[in-house]
Amino acid sequence: MDDKVSEKESSPKQTEEDSEGKMAHVQPASYVNKKKYVFGKTLGAGTFGVVRQAKNTETGEDVAVKILIKKALKGNKVQLEALYDELDILQRLHHPNIVAFKDWFESKDKFYIITQLAKGGELFDRILKKGKFTEEDAVRILVEILSAVKYMHSQNIVHRDLKPENLLYIDKSDESPLVVADFGIAKRLKSDEELLYKPAGSLGYVAPEVLTQDGHGKPCDIWSIGVITYTLLCGYSAFRAERVQDFLDECTTGEYPVKFHRPYWDSVSNKAKQFILKALNLDPSKRPTAAELLEDPWIICTELKTHNLLPGLKEGLDARQKFRNSVERVRLNMKIQKLRDLYLEQTESDSDFDEGSQANGSVPPLKATDTSQLSKKLSEEEQSKLKSELTSKAFAQLVNTVLAEKEKFLNINRVCSSDSDLPGSDIKSLDEAKEKPEGKDTKTEE
């Protein structure tokens, strides 16, 4: 695609500079586009806004809408730059395995980014519903991920946050393409060799060089693919550290950054393990590119193992998903309430946040109207106390669920970490491989 973007595509950055002056007067010209969309349920929430499902009434297409509050972004140059980068990157990428950009517009107080809606669910959720999962199935998935990353890297774009939660199916059919989503911290490099130095990513999937701030580029995405592949084949994550230094210690202790615990890895081929170790090379300059991994012996092998890995996968993946879902239900409602408290007037009725803001199975977040009717009778201190009590009760109803799921999840971790490694001969076919010394066990994610 031509490096030059259209006037409309480049205008968010320009219009934002004038937005403060407009906020007290009229809506920006692009706001008329909002009339095309009917908003539905809330899909997620963050520090600066929410993501909601919507329908384009002109085309009938379901879409995802990221809504960002300008007040929250005001004065935050880093986040504003990330917003402009995301818009620029989304408009440059056109690939069947990358979520498609649809539109953008703004109101006097919000930005709206419209993208393709992936209705088929997350990668690991789909696997849990299968009756069988083999290495052949894993390879098909990785070909889609690698194809997307190869294309991104050819455009000098680094995703920097590849993880299972950002790998989504477009629809529920068996033929649905898998797409890479969430380019919120992606960066467009000025050259093939440019390095970035500010840390970004998700602990457990982020490459070591990102955290040590030694400079990172395209190879950091390859590391993330290695971690995803590891979990794809065993059901638990390669690392369980919850702090940066613990993670760095975990992946640098021993000759290899990960171990293949038995019995979980007994039925996985050596070629698959070699693929993982190549992607998880601690030296980013020695990691293969996405194009090279597409030609890896494991990926192009015509006689892959057909052993059903699903029974072993389900225990780990199911505990992982239930724990994460419980935590996310709490986080979603707390984030939405915080956004209301910080940036919306108490009496303001804001359809962008009220309708459909409840996470499935969770306690409804407080609405501004819950206390507005009492405002004349209660002092500010009393109102604040009431809101705090209501929030605490809502949170308390969820905390037991989270703790229960966490205990199940940690039980899986303990089993994995207590198992011995596979015999050293199991990985000796690697170039320059030696018998792996005993070191710190690698365990599951937080």
UniProtKB/Swiss-Prot annotation:
Q: Which InterPro entries match?
A: Kinase-like_dom_sf, Prot_kinase_dom, Protein_kinase_ATP_BS, Ser/Thr_kinase_AS
Q: Which PANTHER family match?
A: SERINE/THREONINE-PROTEIN KINASE
Give the EC number(s) under which this enzyme is classified.
Answer: 2.7.11.17
Q: How does it assemble?
A: Multimeric.
Instruction: Give residue numbers for the modification (Phosphotyrosine).
Output: 343
Instruction: List every stretch annotated Disordered.
Output: 1-25, 349-380, 415-446
Query: A GO biological process this protein is involved in?
Result: signal transduction
Question: SMART domains recorded for this chain?
Answer: S_TKc (SM00220)
Q: Taking every annotated instance into account, which residue ranges of this chain make up the domain Protein kinase?
A: 37-299
Function, as annotated: Important in cellular regulation.
Q: Which Gene3D superfamilies match?
A: Transferase(Phosphotransferase) domain 1
The GO terms describing molecular function are: ATP binding; calcium/calmodulin-dependent protein kinase activity; calmodulin binding; protein kinase activity; protein serine kinase activity
The name this protein carries in UniProt is Calcium/calmodulin-dependent protein kinase I
For the region Calmodulin-binding, what residue ranges are annotated?
312-323
Annotated catalytic residues: 161 (proton acceptor)
Q: What other remark does the UniProt record contain for this protein?
A: Present with 1520 molecules/cell in log phase SD medium.
Specify residue ranges for compositional bias: Basic and acidic residues: 1-23, 428-446
